[in-house]
């Protein structure tokens, strides 16, 4: 965790985080879990275990990721992930909900004054998790579904039918064929079991010429005609942790799921940490460093850039990173770079 905190602090000092302010001074923090190891033969004491269809034991490791996101930026800023593993001496599997408690508590401890809006899917829209967020002074935009939040949807529809809710339609500013349709109700009970826990309900449809997309969220942010579009953008932005983060880590050259060596203790989790740390550094460079951006454009992809970097490290004597990036952009000039003949 200290390595992530050090890089994050450097980004703060460089005012990088100012680009990620989303709403009323708050930052969007997306949380989601993913698996990075599974096997029926290789295991360690910290593997979670489940039975396959044939009663064969399947061992696996997962992690919970947390990344700062913004609708207008492709790059994300990962925080230190939380491994989902069995602790020493434990017989029960760890789970995403417990990992979220640890990750959120660590995040608040390390960043006590960072204003955060947590964005998650419908699995997180439960009373214990929302109470955890409230205790840590974090706001939320959480997906909800009729199947798991029947009473909430019923109350929202009843309030709208009685004229106690609000509606708004607006044409998209960039594409007149698209209409944004909002319906919202404030101060509803989360469910029948937790009537004291009040939330605001937002129903949104994006109506286009070929299809209509439908989303629903709960939030504790104020819902008004001036805020619903922004909050919708924040809720839909959650996909960045799935696509821009986990998909990139698994399929775009970082090889998060590759078994570099499982070890007998925490080696698998350490490799996952190091992969996420490398991803953090790359994301910040892609967002802020003109030389890195030029080098990436010159080499067409991150894989191409990494291949060229490895080659230059093997054959060139480099004094600093600036020299490396100039070589990646313009080629190794004989007058500025010495070949390593040792």
Where are these regions (language model features)?
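Active-site-proximal, Lys/Arg-enriched surface segment
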Residues: 1-73
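Electropositive, glycine- and tryptophan-enriched low-complexity nucleic-acid-binding patches
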Residues: 51-114
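Short, structured patches in soluble enzyme cores that scaffold and shape functional sites
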Residues: 68-70, 83, 122, 142-146, ...
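Domain-level cores of phosphate- or acyl-group-handling catalytic modules
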Residues: 90-149
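An anionic, glycine-rich sequence signature occurring as long contiguous blocks
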Residues: 145-238
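A short, flexible helix-boundary coil/loop motif
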Residues: 169-172, 177-186, 250-342
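Short amphipathic alpha-helical "interface-anchor" segments enriched in bulky aromatics
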Residues: 225-260
């Amino acid at each position: 965790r200290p390595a992530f905190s050090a890089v994050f602090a450097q980004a703060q000092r460089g005012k990088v985080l100012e680009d990620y302010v989303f709403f009323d001074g708050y930052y969007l923090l997306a949380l989601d879990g993913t698996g990075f190891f599974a096997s029926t033969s290789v295991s360690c004491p910290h593997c979670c275990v489940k039975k396959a269809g044939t009663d064969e034991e399947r061992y696996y490791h997962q992690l919970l990721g947390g990344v700062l996101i913004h609708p207008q930026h492709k790059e994300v800023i990962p925080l230190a992930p939380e491994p989902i593993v069995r602790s020493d001496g434990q017989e029960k599997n760890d789970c995403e909900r417990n990992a979220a408690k640890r990750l959120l508590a660590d995040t608040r401890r390390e960043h006590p004054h960072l204003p955060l809006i947590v964005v998650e899917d419908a699995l997180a829209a439960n009373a214990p998790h929302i109470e955890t967020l409230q205790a840590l002074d974090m706001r939320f935009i959480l997906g909800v579904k009729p199947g798991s939040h029947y009473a909430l949807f019923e109350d929202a529809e009843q309030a709208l039918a009685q004229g106690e809710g609000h509606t708004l339609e607006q044409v998209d500013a960039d594409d007149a064929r698209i209409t944004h349709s909002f319906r919202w109700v404030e101060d509803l009970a989360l469910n029948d079991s937790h009537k004291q826990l009040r939330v605001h309900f937002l129903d949104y449809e994006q109506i286009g010429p070929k299809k209509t997309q439908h989303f629903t969220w709960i939030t504790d942010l104020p819902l008004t005609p001036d805020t619903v579009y922004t909050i919708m953008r924040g809720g839909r932005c959650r996909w960045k942790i799935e696509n821009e983060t986990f998909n990139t880590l698994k399929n775009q050259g970082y090889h998060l799921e590759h078994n570099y060596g499982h070890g007998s203790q925490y080696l698998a989790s350490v490799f996952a940490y190091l992969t996420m740390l490398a991803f953090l550094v790359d994301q910040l460079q892609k967002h802020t460093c003109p030389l890195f951006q030029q080098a990436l454009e010159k080499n067409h992809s991150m894989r191409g850039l990494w291949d060229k970097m490895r080659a230059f490290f093997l054959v060139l004597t480099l004094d600093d990173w600036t020299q490396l990036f100039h070589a990646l952009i313009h080629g190794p000039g004989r007058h500025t770079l010495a070949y390593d003949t040792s």
